[in-house]
């Protein structure tokens, strides 16, 4: 378990000291969602009344958070894991959208106020980004990184381009090995 948590801490760029607490927080939230889903699955009459409404609210909430696809069923809640939860954090979404070269750099950009959602400047790397907020994620208005000519942005584009080329080379070599 400890090795697994250290691996998650490295992969998602969590704090070096106290990063385990962030993982435990996500595991705790996941456990609450799963317990609620298991309670609803165990009910015989979950199709009408209060339980139907509770089930619908749970599914809508998790869909809005980006943890489930629309049209999912209560059983799908049990398939969510900690990595799904960690990948919905602001820090991870900033990295996946290409605004930072690494998870740690994404955390640094957020903490120093260079990232905003809409007009709201965000400084909490652990904030869970809703699906509808993903499109409005960008650099802050007062951030020097907003300028596409900034050396950081140029270096970021170069790094992304190199990663894409490396992936293409790996795909080509694996295709040749299969032939």
Regions found by a protein language model. Give the residues of each.
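Beta-rich strand-turn-strand
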Residues: 100-104, 112
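Ferredoxin-like alpha/beta domains used as RNA- or RNAP-binding modules
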Residues: 1-97, 116, 120-179
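DNA-binding alpha-helical recognition surfaces that contact promoter or target DNA
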Residues: 108
């Amino acid at each position: 378990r400890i090795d697994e948590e250290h691996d998650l801490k490295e992969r998602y760029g969590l704090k070096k000291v106290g990063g385990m607490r962030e993982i435990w927080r996500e595991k705790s939230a996941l456990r609450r969602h799963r317990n609620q889903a298991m309670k609803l699955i165990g009910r015989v009459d979950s199709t009408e009344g209060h339980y139907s409404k509770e089930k619908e609210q749970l599914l809508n909430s998790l869909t809005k958070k980006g943890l489930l696809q629309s049209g999912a069923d209560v059983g799908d809640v049990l398939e969510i894991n900690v990595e799904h939860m960690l990948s919905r954090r602001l820090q991870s979404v900033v990295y996946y959208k290409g605004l930072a070269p690494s998870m740690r750099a994404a955390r640094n950009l957020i903490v120093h106020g260079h990232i905003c959602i809409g007009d709201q400047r965000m400084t909490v790397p652990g904030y869970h980004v809703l699906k509808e907020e993903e499109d409005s994620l960008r650099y802050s208005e007062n951030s020097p990184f907003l300028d596409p000519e900034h050396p950081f942005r140029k270096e970021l584009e170069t790094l992304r381009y190199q990663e894409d080329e490396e992936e293409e080379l790996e795909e080509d070599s694996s295709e040749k090995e299969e032939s």
